[in-house]
């Protein structure tokens, strides 16, 4: 009789107090799993000499030692079971004396309490290992004259097994199943996987059946996983006797692969269906188009409520303001939206914008004011260390110290004015040659204008760009009569009560103006018109309707006075060069030579 033997086995257990359970009658519907492979021709049980589990697993003290299968056949010596389960079944089938057998004739010795013959029509393959794509583990060589013990299917190696309430419900369910009819179906074999890791013992945790896998607990540290081909037996509730047992669907491949579910396919703005991300956030096509149109048209919305309107699939079109604010709140990026000039040019940006970002008058005025404040000394940082109010007048000629002080004040102011000019919007976009030409041509005018605006002519105080404060008498010998003209201009400028924004625009107009030798005069003219428009709007807003034109004309009338004072300053530098007491700095000498009107 051919036999199939598990890889490890021990002698059959001796009769004991559990023998009376072996005659427990079983129902024909297989309420308990039975796979009886014994036949009337089976030889008497013979002991085996195979090693037990305790030989291979340290600390194992359980009684689960054998897993036996037996098929009826002719009286032949036990064949070696070194091949896989599929090859063993085929060899048994080709035996000349083998006959067809029924599934009821199978018997499994081990822990597998569950119906096996009812839903055989759901078997997906002839072998459970073929279904899961893993080969069966090869059993160990057989032992001659080994016979399986005649035990009850529910009398396992762990002692008497009393079904739990769950399996009592399973018994009631299996009794209602129709009996199998028709031709006998070949059984599905099992695939034994090696121990995977520690797990609680069978006595501590009940046996659980999963959709396609049943786990037999062998001990506190060992377990075997038995793959089955009955996915239709997957429980749909914590109890196996639930009403949906037979109708439990086989999980689809998408569900088994962990496909995204829940809110991952919902629009982050309104909750509608969303297939992919738009502008950095998963949104629906409606919210994507709404956000795109709003950004491209630079639309401005107004909420008629309290700016907290609900935005969902049904009410998303009620308040455009709240919908756009929610688009921004969930993380949609406005900079990603292509403008009208970029339509059809996916992935490409213009090399240089046609218009600087600070094109609006409000932004331009803010930038001019910020540049002016950053370039001037604060009141708290004024330097009075050299200030002397009582100074005896010197009627003689100037000495070298006075001339050196004059040159130092000019060169120090030039660096401050250069940094201020670089912060004017649009000035950095000009060519380097035009930038240098505008700075050198307007330097003396800017020096006079800024000094006159900061100084206090009533007190005779002159406040320079570095924060140094000097009295008028301290500058008389170095500046000559030019200092008196500067103070007179300062008094007239203060009489106009010019605020900081208007003065910032006026200073920029002194720098950005037409000069002889410009490479790009058109760009300079465009920038000048923008600054003039900004100044006009500011004066109109501050002065009011009755007299905006007169205020603007009086303010612009100071520009010709600056040209006259600039010529007077060039004459003073020319006079000091002739005296040759101190050589002028190279930058001052260059400015003097380039600015001469002749």
From Swiss-Prot:
Zinc finger boundaries on the chain: NR C4-type: 267-287, 303-327
UniProt region (Required for nuclear import), positions on chain: 171-466
Residues in NR LBD domain copies: 360-595
Gene3D superfamilies (UniProt xref): Erythroid Transcription Factor GATA-1, subunit A, Retinoid X Receptor
A Gene Ontology term for the protein's cellular component: cytosol
SUPFAM superfamilies tied to this protein: Glucocorticoid receptor-like (DNA-binding domain), Nuclear receptor ligand-binding domain
Annotated spans, Disordered: 1-50, 120-159, 341-361
GO biological process: cellular response to corticotropin-releasing hormone stimulus; detection of lipopolysaccharide; fat cell differentiation; inflammatory response; negative regulation of cell cycle; non-canonical inflammasome complex assembly; positive regulation of transcription by RNA polymerase II; regulation of transcription by RNA polymerase II
A single GO molecular function term of this UniProt record: protein heterodimerization activity
Compositionally biased region (Low complexity): 37-50, 134-145
The keyword Transmembrane is annotated on this UniProt entry: no
Cofactor mode of binding and number, as noted: Binds 2 zinc ions.
Renumbered residue ranges of the record's region AF-2: 584-595
Entries under Pfam families matching the protein: Hormone_recep, zf-C4
Residue ranges the UniProt entry marks as DNA-binding: 264-339
Superkingdom of the organism of origin: Eukaryota
Key words of the record: Acetylation, Cytoplasm, DNA-binding, Inflammatory response, Metal-binding, Mitochondrion, Nucleus, Phosphoprotein, Receptor, Transcription, Transcription regulation, Zinc, Zinc-finger
SMART domains recorded: HOLI (SM00430), ZnF_C4 (SM00399)
Posttranslational mods: Phosphorylated at Ser-351 by RPS6KA1 and RPS6KA3 in response to mitogenic or stress stimuli. Acetylated by p300/CBP, acetylation increases stability. Deacetylated by HDAC1.
Region Required for the interaction with RXRA: start-end pairs: 299-361
Localization terms from the record: Cytoplasm, Cytosol; Nucleus; Mitochondrion
Stretches for region Required for binding NBRE-containing DNA: 268-354
Function as written in the Swiss-Prot or TrEMBL entry: Orphan nuclear receptor. Binds the NGFI-B response element (NBRE) 5'-AAAGGTCA-3'. Binds 9-cis-retinoic acid outside of its ligand-binding (NR LBD) domain. Participates in energy homeostasis by sequestrating the kinase STK11 in the nucleus, thereby attenuating cytoplasmic AMPK activation. Regulates the inflammatory response in macrophages by regulating metabolic adaptations during inflammation, including repressing the transcription of genes involved in the citric acid cycle (TCA). Inhibits NF-kappa-B signaling by binding to low-affinity NF-kappa-B binding sites, such as at the IL2 promoter.
Similarity comment: family membership: Belongs to the nuclear hormone receptor family. NR4 subfamily.
Quaternary structure, from the entry: Binds the NGFI-B response element (NBRE) as a monomer. Binds the Nur response element (NurRE), consisting of two inverse NBRE-related octanucleotide repeats separated by 6 base-pairs, as a dimer. Interacts (via N-terminus) with NLRP3 (via LRR repeat domain); the interaction is direct, requires binding of NR4A1/Nur77 to NBRE-containing dsDNA and lipopolysaccharide, and leads to non-canonical NLRP3 inflammasome activation. Interacts with GADD45GIP1. Interacts with STK11.
Protein name (database record): Nuclear receptor subfamily 4 group A member 1
Native species: Canis lupus familiaris (Dog)
């Amino acid at each position: 009789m051919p036999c199939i033997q598990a890889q490890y086995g021990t002698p059959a257990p001796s009769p004991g107090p559990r023998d009376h359970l072996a005659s427990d009658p079983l129902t024909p519907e297989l309420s308990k799993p039975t796979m009886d492979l014994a036949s009337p021709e089976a030889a008497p049980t013979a002991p085996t000499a195979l090693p037990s589990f305790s030989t291979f697993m340290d600390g194992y003290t359980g009684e689960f030692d054998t897993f036996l299968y037996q098929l009826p056949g002719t009286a032949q010596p036990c064949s070696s079971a070194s091949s896989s389960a599929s090859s063993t079944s085929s060899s048994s089938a080709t035996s000349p004396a083998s006959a067809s057998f029924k599934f009821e004739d199978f018997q499994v010795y081990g822990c597998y309490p569950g119906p096996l013959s009812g839903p055989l029509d759901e078997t997906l393959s002839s072998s459970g290992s073929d279904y899961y794509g893993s080969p069966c583990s090869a059993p160990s060589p057989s032992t001659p004259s080994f016979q399986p013990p005649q035990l009850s299917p529910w009398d396992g190696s762990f002692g008497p097994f009393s079904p739990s309430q769950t399996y009592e419900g399973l018994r009631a369910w299996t009794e209602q199943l129709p009996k199998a009819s028709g031709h006998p179906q070949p059984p599905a074999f099992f695939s034994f996987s090696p121990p995977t890791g520690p797990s609680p013992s069978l006595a501590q945790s009940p046996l659980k059946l999963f959709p396609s896998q049943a786990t037999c607990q062998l001990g506190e540290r060992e377990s075997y996983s038995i793959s089955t081909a009955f996915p239709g037996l997957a429980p749909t509730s914590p109890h196996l006797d639930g009403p949906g047992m037979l109708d439990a669907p086989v999980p689809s491949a998408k569900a088994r692969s962990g496909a995204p579910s829940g809110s991952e396919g919902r629009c982050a703005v309104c909750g509608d269906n969303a297939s992919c991300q738009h502008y950095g956030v998963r949104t629906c096509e409606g919210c994507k188009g709404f956000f795109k149109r709003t950004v491209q048209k630079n639309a401005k919305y107004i909420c008629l409520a309290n700016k907290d309107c609900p935005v969902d699939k049904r009410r998303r079109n009620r308040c455009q303001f709240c919908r756009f604010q929610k688009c921004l709140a969930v993380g949609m990026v406005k900079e990603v939206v292509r403008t009208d000039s970029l339509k059809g040019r996916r992935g490409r940006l213009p090399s240089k914008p046609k218009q600087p970002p600070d094109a609006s008058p409000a932004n331009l005025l803010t930038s001019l004011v910020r540049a002016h404040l950053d370039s001037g000394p604060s009141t708290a940082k004024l330097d009075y260390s050299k200030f002397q109010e009582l100074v005896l007048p010197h009627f003689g000629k100037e000495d070298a110290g006075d001339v050196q002080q004059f040159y130092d004040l000019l060169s120090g102011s030039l660096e401050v004015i250069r940094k201020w000019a670089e912060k004017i919007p649009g000035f950095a976009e000009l060519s380097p040659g035009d930038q240098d030409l505008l700075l050198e041509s307007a330097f003396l005018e800017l020096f006079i204008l800024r000094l006159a605006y900061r100084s206090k002519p009533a007190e005779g105080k002159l406040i320079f760009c570095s924060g140094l404060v000097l009295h008028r008498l301290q500058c008389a010998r170095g500046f000559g009569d030019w200092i008196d003209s500067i103070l007179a201009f300062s008094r007239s400028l203060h009489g106009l009560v010019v605020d900081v924004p208007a003065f910032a625009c006026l200073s920029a107009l002194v720098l950005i103006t037409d000069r002889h030798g410009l490479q790009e005069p058109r760009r300079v003219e465009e920038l000048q018109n923008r600054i003039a428009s900004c100044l006009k709007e500011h004066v109109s807003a501050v002065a009011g309707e009755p007299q905006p034109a007169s205020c603007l004309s009086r303010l612009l009338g100071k520009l010709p006075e600056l040209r006259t004072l600039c010529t007077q300053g060039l004459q003073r530098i020319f006079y000091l060069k002739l005296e040759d007491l101190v050589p002028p700095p190279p930058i001052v000498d260059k400015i003097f030579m380039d600015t001469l009107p002749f």
